[in-house]
Amino acid sequence: MEKEQILDFTRRISQSNRSGLTVINYEIIFAYLDDAKKAYQEEKWEEFKVALRKAQNSIGELMQTLDFSYDISRNLYRIYVFCKDSLAAAMYKRSLTEIENAEKMLRKLYQSFCK
C-alpha cells in the first residue's frame, strides 16, 4: 500500500462513524489484494504472502465487529471465514483465482455497506 493511501485511510478513519469504518476496512482489504496481485505479477512471493496476510487480518477485523445478536452476523461470519480461507489457499497455491473469488464476494458486501 502506498504511503499516500495509508495517510488517506488514517485521515478518513479519524473522521468516520462505525458504518464508515466498515466501508474503509473493505477499501483497505481491496488495497492489500491489489498489492498481492501486483506482487504475483512480479513474482515477488514474499510480498505476495505479506499482502495476503494483511488482507486476512483486515477481514479478521470485520469479523470482530460483528454483533451476533443479529442473524445476518452469522451469515457474514461464514462469508468472512470463506474469504480468509480462500486467501490462505491463494497463498499456498500461488494462485489469483482464490483471490478473485474472495474479492468478488467482498465487493458485493462492500456495495451493500456503501448504501
Locate predicted features.
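N-terminal intrinsically disordered, cationic/polar leader segments
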Residues: 1-35, 39-42, 46-52, 57, ...
